[in-house]
UniProtKB/Swiss-Prot annotation:
Specifically methylates position 2 of adenine 2503 in 23S rRNA and position 2 of adenine 37 in tRNAs. S-adenosyl-L-methionine binds at residues 169-170, 199, 228-230, 304. The keyword NADP does not apply. NCBIfam families: rRNA_mod_RlmN (TIGR00048). This is Probable dual-specificity RNA methyltransferase RlmN. Belongs to the radical SAM superfamily. RlmN family. Its cofactor is [4Fe-4S] cluster. Binds 1 [4Fe-4S] cluster. The cluster is coordinated with 3 cysteines and an exchangeable S-adenosyl-L-methionine. The active site is at residues 102, 347. The lineage of its organism: Bacteria, Bacillati, Cyanobacteriota, Cyanophyceae, Synechococcales. Residues 108-344 form the Radical SAM core domain. Pfam families: Radical_SAM (PF04055), RlmN_N (PF21016).
Length: 361
């Protein structure tokens, strides 16, 4: 039968819709020959109802819905969940190309934090970290980052309050995608920038570039920068973070000072405590000297074991003594005991392997 010319043609568009702003969706909708008000409907179904397929949008005309089935939204598939005794859930998510990434949902009272990945694998090869043992495969696109938050929010049936870019990958090596994702998470999904933390081992020039960005979308940059320091001196840092051998710790700290001056935001320093390596009293003194006069905060993270390396977690007494030594030097410090140990979802343990502790999908 000959077509009348009135039936909608099947729409194909390889670029997922997730991550697009309302004006961008308006342009897309009008290009499909639809009235611009459909964009607001699409926007609401993408970001408030977390749809996986455009055919789910019941307010669209049936014929047009059917023509849109091939248009990718940009959602992943949960292939596995593993749960720690604290209630933290690690998710293995299958992407459109079959690759697997990890995201973690971390409950705390009435709040829900999502730890997101920014890359598939990681090129930094930090000696204590499981992710780096598998090498780097590719960057994640903005929609693949945004999807992790929507997936956890949908699974928990609870609004996400905080996001930490501390999953797989080095966020500042994928900065454009990370900033695009943060713009959407903040302005389209409604998660405050002050509830978002971006972590980095420190890439030469990238912290300054981040500071000079100044804005995310049409809003001032207000998220927290967390720098994975992990050592009080260059020798220990070179051992733990091979990439730091070409980036002196003094240069890193100067770039962090510039960041504070430009943005007015303090820097958080992450410091994983490893028994017998960087947890001694004299090393607490060295760390305090490094950070003297710095607008910063230190998160001490007792090491979370992985199979591939021999590092050990210090005793609680040693952790407390290290923290007290910093406080005596007027360094703001918090001890972060990880909640995801039972699910291999703690800091340094993410590697996109299936866990034996799972819930049904």
């Amino acid at each position: 039968m000959a077509r009348s010319g009135l039936e909608p043609q099947t729409v194909t568009d390889a670029t997922p819709l997730l991550g697009r702003s309302l004006p961008e969706l308006q342009d897309w909708v009008v290009a499909q020959g639809q009235p611009s008000y459909r964009a607001k409907q699409l926007y609401q179904w993408l970001y408030e109802r977390s749809i996986h397929n455009l055919a789910e949008i019941s307010v669209f005309p049936k014929a047009w819905r059917q023509s849109l089935q091939a248009v990718p939204v940009g959602r992943s598939q949960i292939v596995d969940r593993s749960v720690s005794p604290s209630g933290t859930i690690k998710y293995l998510l299958r992407l459109h190309d079959g690759e697997i990434i990890e995201a973690v949902g971390i409950p705390s009272g009435d709040r829900l934090t999502v730890c997101v990945s920014s890359q598939l694998g990681c090129a930094m090869a930090c000696d204590f970290c499981a992710t780096g043992k598998g090498g780097f495969r590719r960057h994640l696109a903005p929609h693949e980052i945004i999807d992790q938050v929507l997936t956890v929010q949908e699974d928990w049936q609870q609004r996400v309050s905080n996001i930490v870019f501390m999953g797989m990958g080095e966020p500042l090596l994928n900065l454009d995608a990370v900033l695009a994702a943060i713009r959407c998470l903040n302005q389209d999904i409604g998660i405050g920038q002050r509830g978002i933390t971006v972590s980095t081992v420190g890439i030469p020039g990238h912290i300054r570039r981040l500071a000079e960005t100044k804005r995310v979308g049409d809003r001032p940059l207000q998220f927290t920068l967390a720098v994975s320091l992990h050592a009080p001196n260059q020798a220990i840092r070179d051992r733990l973070i091979p990439s730091s051998r070409h980036y002196p710790i003094t240069d890193l700290l100067q770039e962090c000072r510039d960041y504070v001056q430009i943005t007015g935001r303090r820097v958080t320093f992450e410091y994983i405590l490893l028994a017998g390596l960087n947890d001694q009293p004299e090393q607490a003194e060295q760390l305090a000297q490094l950070l003297r006069g710095f607008q910063s905060h230190v998160n001490l993270i007792p090491y979370n074991p992985i199979d591939e390396v021999e590092y050990q977690r210090p005793s609680k007494a040693r952790v407390d003594a290290f923290a007290d030594a910093l406080r005596q030097q007027r360094v703001a410090v918090t001890v972060r005991w990880s909640k995801g140990l039972g699910a291999d979802a703690a800091c340094g343990q993410l590697r996109a392997n299936r866990s034996t502790a799972t819930l049904p999908a």
